[in-house]
Amino acid sequence: MKITKITSHVLGYDLPETLGYSQQYYKKRTSHIVEVETDEGVTGWGECFGPGNIAFANKGIVEKVIQPIVLGMQALDRDVIWHKVYNLMRDHGQKGMPLQALSGVDIALWDIAGKAANLPLYKMIGGAHRDKVEVYGYGMMLRPENINSLISRFKEESAEIKEMGFKALKMKVGVGPKDDIKLIEAVREGIGDSFRFMVDANHGYTTHDALYVGRAMEEFSPYWFEEPVAPEDLDGYRELRALLKVNISGGEAEFNRWGWRKLLESRGLDIAQPEVCALGGISEYLRVLALCHSHFTPVVNHVWGSAIAVAVNLHLLAAMPPLPGGLFPWEPMLEFDTTHNHFIDDLLTVSLDIKNQVKSNNGTVSLPNGPGLGVTPQRDFLNKFRIDS
């Protein structure tokens, strides 16, 4: 079964309201879906991490760099393809966009392999350790509002996400240390004393400010403090983990096994958050997962993007071995975007229906059971939302 064509579908639409995090505001949602075709008529689907103009840069890498390398190769030779592409791109970047582009292609090749074997992805990996996956909802995004408006909205929105049935929720911070503490307090007030919530700084702090905010948030008992400092600041991560009671999480901005080896050896993480659509795809994710578990670091995948990314992560989380195991093992969670997202709600021929499942199944969702990823994008949807710039 030979690869005959690779197509990047960059999708976009204007959001009904501005969203943001510590690094930027944005008014347009984008997604980068990868389609790999074969000479036997089997098509695979994948996704590349990277918003906005990053998606167009990655499209160029997928179609102009990776495609010429792999055309005519056997689609089932995933590991051969991964290393051939990586080795030829290594001199031009071992992290970032080359890996994001490779991720989408690799995911699509796993989808093809599952379809060829007539097995769902989680079976291809080795089987499901759980038949349902717990889900947390993220929202409480920043907007260009004054702090009083943000406080009011965060309190209200957090209560709404809890009411939707999610097992936990995640909020953004990034408007300044003192005001961020006010936002954290508002969310705790909105959800009550015992509901689990997490705080995501998107590497917006210096180590000093992260320590200030981290100590202040301990009063409100968040479950983790995500990306408190820049991903390059391994010493900062290690210092914060040693000095704070809250779990320190991160890793969405790390790539491949070699980057993850350094991150894990620094001992700066309580919880690892690999991003399969960025770090090198499923092939590399499985190697990174093994590294995390060899360091006894629990994993909660970072998830951002379309329903393709959601489906991939459902399979990966189902197939994730328990760490450390036991009668009542620690359970990973699926990260789910509760904000306006056509690319989750409307992309597929058959919706994953995450929100309704969460509401009716005590905060959990079932696994896709079709071959490969078990999901298929609507061709008309791809055509409707495709953008060229």
Predicted ranges, named:
Residues 48, 137-139, 171-173, 199-203, ...:
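A cross-domain feature marking catalytic cores of carbohydrate-active enzymes
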